[in-house]
């Protein structure tokens, strides 16, 4: 509709106080319908908006993964159709959308991302970690925390000072 109206839509140069352009803003605040409307006016002259970084050093794909727990997959589909980079790295940590989805324990999104043909599952962030490395670390932390909690409870239940390993 808008693109066929004959009007030239200017999308460049408009930033909010977060450094969000319109693609960032709709990724954060909008819904899927807003992104579909944006898709109508994205062209080769302004496609860079999908790859630009905001003041938090994130592209629109990172914003969706980090901030939308309900419609992330639907929004990402539209953004990717417009030309967003599924393997784009945020500038502050070098994390890709897959790194961020793993870090936030968003299993459904991780599974969907891993099925995308162009996804780089072995991308390294600035800490030289793959998404798989992050998943393993998070599991190990959970296990370690569970063991530490068990040790605390054992000491409460056995104040005599007996060591947990002595009873095994």
Swiss-Prot record:
Record-linked PROSITE patterns: ANK_REP_REGION, ANK_REPEAT
SUPFAM superfamilies xref list: Ankyrin repeat
GO molecular function: NF-kappaB binding
Gene3D superfamilies the UniProt entry points to: Ankyrin repeat-containing domain (1.25.40.20)
InterPro entries: Ankyrin_rpt, Ankyrin_rpt-contain_sf, NF-kappa-B_inhibitor
Biological process terms in GO annotation: cellular response to tumor necrosis factor; symbiont-mediated suppression of host NF-kappaB cascade
ANK repeats: from-to residues: 56-88, 93-123
UniProt keyword terms in alphabetical order: ANK repeat, Host-virus interaction, Inhibition of host NF-kappa-B by virus, Repeat
Free-text function comment from the UniProt entry: Suppresses the host immune response through NF-kappa-B inactivation. Possesses ankyrin repeat domains required for NF-kappa-B binding but lacks the regulatory regions required for dissociation from NF-kappa-B and degradation. Therefore, prevents host NF-kappa-B release and subsequent activation.
Similarity field: Belongs to the polydnaviridae I-Kappa-B-like protein family.
Official protein name in the record: I-Kappa-B like protein G2
Native source organism of the sequence: Microplitis demolitor bracovirus (isolate Webb) (MdBV)
Lineage: Viruses, Viruses incertae sedis, Polydnaviriformidae, Bracoviriform, Microplitis demolitor bracovirus
Gene: G4
